[in-house]
């Protein structure tokens, strides 16, 4: 069995780790970095860039550079959160035929699962390069507060990337695994996870290798991206006041503002003041305009204070659901890059009444935990039991549009629960089961996961038929629902797939696209390798021809020069096969030149040897003077 890798698929950055003996190890990518920006770009010539190369060109290619796409995963186009994002990002968010939010570049649409798959492919390649073997299984993390549609979309992304997703694991739970694996830590902990796009808090009980999640809460649209946008809006407003130009209308300027905001935010975690300097940010009739501004930590904290405060209520709800007070929490573990912000640490300290634990790397701990879970599934990590929970209540719509819960939030998974319902009208021969997830009392206010019909109910007075509805949640938090008429034993069941979501046909098409892209990437790589090889041969042949060309026949020299000319011409194209053919032709033609060079070398060596043979070794006899000298008395 090959290695199973652990992947933290983040909003801003992603990370991959693997078990190395008894320890989990983060793997560096091709650029030598331990985390990879979760950014995908389409270049002018249609090449797909992922990670750091995509981030580097974002300023000059804002409309075809997709970032923070995780926030769109499993969301509908008309979702209020998507509406909010549409105003803030320079790339196009469009409505797919199934009503989901997708992204578009150059008329080509991509689902968020597909964009996530490009990032997962990069993680897969990073692991394969490190391990020297093919990787096709993974554990992938998601925010604890992700609903069923978002979890399913993440699993789809893994499939598109060519990975069998053995387990979807919650990010705070993964962090707790990494924190508590050494078995010495026991007690109750809170994991406060403020990442690039999402916020989660989980309360866990740890002891004797058992990691039991007591409760979880969060906000899937709150993270570092929101902090960045606050600063972007502030900078744009200040510039408009000074210069009368709205930078939000210029996508290129907006991308530069975003990069500057992210940089300033990071710097203000370790310094109390920073300077934002963006020369030639725009221009008008009077000439170019520059943006220069000093920003203090206090000002930045004031701008984002309400965002930090938004993390408090989920923490209180999680404590309440776990039946605990803040004082009963033994340790608070900080996860996610945003927890480096002093203001965030201060709020956590005030809320829990203790200094938060900073002994884990907030950018890497989730991937490390995912790799540990991969080790558990592979049998490499023993005596670890993970008991997670479902973050939101699950139920169906009943008479009057009421949401009737079948599985309450924070129920340990996997789990299976049933409840018996009946018909609302006389002689009703079919029922529609509408499945929802959420905490509101009316079904319409919650997230609909899907619906199906149970047909063929025998005619009876209302309230007589007994219809048993069963919810089954697997260890990934993904839901299956069945309905059974107890009188006829007729049953209908579905794996919940949101009214949007990707169909199997969509996924198959995207898998094929990904494979085709992998072939295209391979072709490009082969062309580059062939060019490098050809360039080296051209250089060495030209040098040899200049130094030793006189030692071959004129016809042979002309053949070499012709082959050189042909190869130089083929180097102008990207046709790897043509380049390889011309390279072989030149290699064959220049063999005579090589023979002449070796012949000259051999003659030179022979001459040196002959000169050495002319040297006469002198015979000598050693005389022992002591024998010839007599001792005197």
From Swiss-Prot:
* Gene3D superfamilies for this protein: 1.20.1270.10, 3.30.420.40, Actin, Chain A, domain 4, Substrate Binding Domain Of DNAk, Chain A, domain 1
Report the residues modified as Phosphothreonine. Answer: 198
GO MF = ATP binding; ATP-dependent protein folding chaperone; unfolded protein binding
Q: Where is the composition biased (Basic and acidic residues)?
A: 605-615
Entry keywords, A to Z: ATP-binding, Chaperone, Nucleotide-binding, Phosphoprotein, Stress response
InterPro entries for the chain:
ATPase_NBD, Chaperone_DnaK, Heat_shock_70_CS, HSP70_C_sf, HSP70_peptide-bd_sf, Hsp_70_fam
Q: Supply the induction statement.
A: By stress conditions e.g. heat shock.
Q: Which domain of life is it from?
A: Bacteria
Q: Where is the segment annotated Disordered? A: 515-537, 599-633
Compositionally biased residues, Acidic residues: 616-625
Q: Family assignment?
A: Belongs to the heat shock protein 70 family.
NCBIfam families associated with the record: PRK00290.1, PRK05183.1, prok_dnaK
Give the function comment from the record: Acts as a chaperone.
Name of this protein = Chaperone protein DnaK
Naturally occurring in which organism (per UniProt): Rhodopseudomonas palustris (strain BisB5)
Q: What is the lineage of its organism?
A: Bacteria, Pseudomonadati, Pseudomonadota, Alphaproteobacteria, Hyphomicrobiales
